[in-house]
Structure formats: structure tokens, C-alpha cells
């Protein structure tokens, strides 16, 4: 069993007799000398989809739930349901739009490296790759010779995601975005 300080985002844990998915972790450090670090976790109940916040001491032991990862591709939208197809055995996994709204900012028909996390064969989350390539749909005009400056401007992707990009980047260009930090990394390889 790992300690609370070793738990990572998207881990499936057992707590109070239920299985939860860890969606966010914040480390809280008290200002006293004797204060131990606390880890505040945003947990989503796998069965009901409800969310709760729990705090754990850094050395508190946490039980991991048994979960599996399946490589998937985005397939289609059916009303409020987003359907992802297993890349190996073509099993469909349905997600309600509200449960994956943050992940949808990075998902297009061409997104590679997506994985579905399942607990007891039930889909509980979409795991994004570390980086995604996306095409800029809207940004201010590029400025020639601006590659020497570090100034940025907002750029909006087709999914609605907004990231800061260097001034020399133009609309229609494909860029690489870090999914964890929602930041521009570089121009994407044009293949």
C-alpha cells in the first residue's frame, strides 16, 4: 500500500468502502515546525460519479483499487455521450460529457495516445497523453521577426482550449501542447 504522498493523479483508490478516482491533488504544508504535510485530493466516486474532497496525512497508507488501462480512439458523439473505441478489441466505452469536460478540450478525431481507465470493467476516466498536437483555429496575426522576443498571445483551438503562444505563431498552424500544464511546447511536426 502506498503512502498518500506517493499517490498520483488518475490513481484509483479505495476509501471508506468505495472506489474513487483521484482527479486532482494539492499539497498543503502547515506553517508550524511540527506540522506534517497534508494532501488534499479531489475524488470522484466510480459508482455514482459524485465528487468529494478528502485530506490525507503524507504518511497515511492508502489502498489502491484494481484498475486497467485500455488504448482507445475517439469514435463519435451520441447526444450527451462520447463514445471511445478500444484500439485492440473494439469495445466501446461511453462517457457522459459532464464527466470528461476537462479532457474534451484536448480531444479531436485525430488525438493519439488516449487511454480509458476501467475499474471492474466499468470505464471511469479518460487519460490523456503527455502532449497533443492541435491546430490553431483563431489567434492574432503573426508578427514577422518576433521569434527573438518572449512575448505571447492567446490562441484558441477548435475544441475551445485557449493557450498562450509566441507572437510568430499564426492561425492554421499545428502546435504541440502539454496536457498537464495546458501550455504551448513547440510547433508540431508536419507529417
Swiss-Prot record:
GO terms for biological process: peptide biosynthetic process. GO terms for cellular component: cytoplasm. It comes from the Bacteria. GO terms for molecular function: translation elongation factor activity. Transmembrane segments: none annotated. SUPFAM superfamilies: Nucleic acid-binding proteins, Translation proteins SH3-like domain. SMART domains: EFP, Elong-fact-P_C. Pfam families: EFP (PF01132), EFP_N (PF08207), Elong-fact-P_C (PF09285). Disulfide bonds: none annotated. InterPro entries: Elong-fact-P_C, NA-bd_OB-fold, Rib_uL2_dom2, Transl_elong_fac_P/YeiP, Transl_elong_KOW-like, Transl_elong_p-like_YeiP, Transl_elong_P/YeiP_cen, Transl_elong_P/YeiP_CS. PANTHER family: ELONGATION FACTOR P, TRANSLATION ELONGATION FACTOR KOW-LIKE DOMAIN-CONTAINING PROTEIN. NCBIfam families: PRK04542.1 (NF003392), yeiP (TIGR02178). Belongs to the elongation factor P family. HAMAP family: EFP (MF_00646). This is Elongation factor P-like protein. It comes from Photobacterium profundum (strain SS9).
